[in-house]
Amino acid sequence: MANFPASLLILNGKSADNQPLREAITLLRDEGIQIHVRVTWEKGDAQRYVDEARRLGVETVIAGGGDGTINEVSTALIQIRDGVAPALGLLPLGTANDFATSAGIPEALDKALKLAIAGNAMEIDMAMVNDKTCFINMATGGFGTRITTETPEKLKAALGGVSYLIHGLMRMDTLTPDRCEIRGENFHWQGDALVIGIGNGRQAGGGQQLCPTALINDGLLQLRIFTGEELLPALFSTLTQSDDNPNIIDGASAWFDIHAPHEITFNLDGEPLSGQEFHIEVLPGALRCRLPPDCPLLR
């Protein structure tokens, strides 16, 4: 792999003392691969490190962390307007790793690193909310959002993605739907939603397949709404198929407009955004990402 160009790894501070990662990087450096490592400490670090990556001339910026880290790095990359932006590499080190998991990124650190450095760079979509905030994986609203934002950090650290399910079951007594209206291309729905998923990717909340048919290079966002009493399918990986369940509503569009009579909260790759009006649109081919050749999220 010695002929591959340099990469810069932006590592979430929580993983700074990851000894297996240190060993994997050392082995690759011994093979002649140049890998710069930068550790995030506060919001805005990812943007600064992407700027540094441009100055260094690296061809890949690797996001080492969970969905939030991937979001920060990818958002910084798509803001590059002059010249060709570095490709995005994925190194899943977070609690849930929903985007990387659904994209087929290897769990083994050495294999994930090699893919992030040497894999084929494919153009993929991102999404933007209210012309400001971006997400690469999914926007979720309703009860599921409250669970993912309220799950204690110690529980997530101990149990990983399963912690969301356990905390959700503990909070079943607080279950209330969000009334809203959603419009898209050839789509209109109004009612009470327990869970809303608008996906560029397929899963959120620690492995829940909220948008099981979503693709990251089709120029569309997938929508899934859970209504009525159908919370459990959202928590248990959608046990019932949407084609025979009237309480699961699906849609696809390049954009969605959401209006609510009261404030609701969406979780964008782990970051909450509250309001009553949301305009969500896809950004086709917004960045290049190094993915496995059999990535299930590609058409």
UniProtKB/Swiss-Prot annotation:
Its cofactor is Mg(2+); Ca(2+). The keyword Acetylation does not apply. Residues 2-133 form the DAGKc domain. Ca(2+) 2 binds at residues 242-243, 245, 248. GO terms for molecular function: ATP binding; lipid kinase activity; magnesium ion binding. GO terms for cellular component: cytoplasm. Keywords: ATP-binding, Calcium, Kinase, Lipid biosynthesis, Lipid metabolism, Magnesium, Metal-binding, Nucleotide-binding, Phospholipid biosynthesis, Phospholipid metabolism, Transferase. Binds 1 Mg(2+) ion per subunit. Ca(2+) may be able to substitute. 2 Ca(2+) ions are seen in the crystal structure; one of the two occupies the same site as Mg(2+) in other family members. It comes from the Bacteria. Ca(2+) 1 binds at residues 125, 200, 215, 218, 220. The keyword Lipid metabolism applies. ATP binds at residues 40, 66-72, 95. One of its GO terms (biological process) is phospholipid biosynthetic process. The active site is at residue 271. InterPro entries: ATP-NAD_kinase_N, Diacylglycerol/lipid_kinase, Diacylglycerol_kinase_cat_dom, Lip_kinase_YegS, Lipid_Phosphate_FormReg, NAD/diacylglycerol_kinase_sf, YegS/DAGK_C. Its EC number is 2.7.1.-. Homodimer. May interact with the periplasmic chaperone Skp (also known as OmpH); this suggests the protein may be translocated to the periplasm and then sorted to the outer membrane. In vitro does not phosphorylate diacylglycerol, sphingosine, N,N-dimethylsphingosine; threo-dihydrosphingosine, erythro-dihydrosphingosine, C2 ceramide, C6 ceramide, phosphatidylinositol or dimethylsphingosine. The potential in vivo substrate is unknown. Belongs to the diacylglycerol/lipid kinase family. YegS lipid kinase subfamily. HAMAP family: YegS. This is Probable lipid kinase YegS. It comes from Salmonella typhimurium (strain LT2 / SGSC1412 / ATCC 700720).
